[in-house]
Amino acid sequence: MTAVCLVRHGETDWNLQQKCQGKTDIPLNATGERQARETGEYVKDFSWDIIVTSPLKRAKRTAEIINEYLHLPIVEMDDFKERDYGDAEGMPLEERTKRYPDNIYPNMETLEELTDRLMGGLAKVNQAYPNKKVLIVAHGAAIHALLTEISGGDPELQSTRLVNACLSNIEFAEEKWRIKDYNINSHLSGFIK
């Protein structure tokens, strides 16, 4: 069985400002760095084999901070980058809502493209690290899309907002992925249930 813990990156200033980040390469803020340390402190008590990360700064830095506690190889994979939001990138929520009330942004990566990319990435991880325990540091919409696909569109999961630096655990056994738990955030100071 391959076990994967999906870690959402720590907070950025754009998260606070409710700006659409997508593929825009925004760094962690001080809170995000603290969240990454708290995550590292929490996951160090479990056995891991490797860390896979999106190459975007906010995910990569989260992975590096977590790795201060684990001392593992880190592998970057483009498959786990955030969704490309096209013309909406950098736009605050209020402006996006006014301009695009249907949440469909010009030049945006489709949900099908995103899901195919992410599931392809998971397949590569499973092939490269069979029966291993893998931390994957990625992004909110990316993790949400993976969980939605694996769950078959579970309505409760679809309505859940994944908090920064939350953990979601999935495993591959009997030729399929399944969700163990998601949006775990009790390790974060000031966590939200």
UniProtKB/Swiss-Prot annotation:
PROSITE patterns the UniProt entry points to: PG_MUTASE
Gene ablation phenotype (knockout): No visible phenotype.
EC numbers for this chain: 3.1.3.-
An annotated GO cellular component: cytoplasm
Gene Ontology MF: a single term: phosphatase activity
Gene that this polypeptide is encoded by: phoE
Family: Belongs to the phosphoglycerate mutase family. GpmB subfamily.
Active site: 9, 82
Top-rank lineage group of the source organism: Bacteria
The protein's name: Uncharacterized phosphatase PhoE
Enzyme class, UniProt record, top EC level: hydrolase
Keywords: Hydrolase
Ranges annotated as spanning the membrane: none
Residue numbers binding substrate: 8, 15, 21, 58, 139
Protein role: Phosphatase with broad substrate specificity. Does not have phosphoglycerate mutase activity.
Any Pfam family matching the protein: His_Phos_1
CDD domains: HP_PGM_like
PANTHER family: ADENOSYLCOBALAMIN_ALPHA-RIBAZOLE PHOSPHATASE, BROAD-SPECIFICITY PHOSPHATASE YOR283W-RELATED
Organism in which the protein naturally occurs: Bacillus subtilis (strain 168)
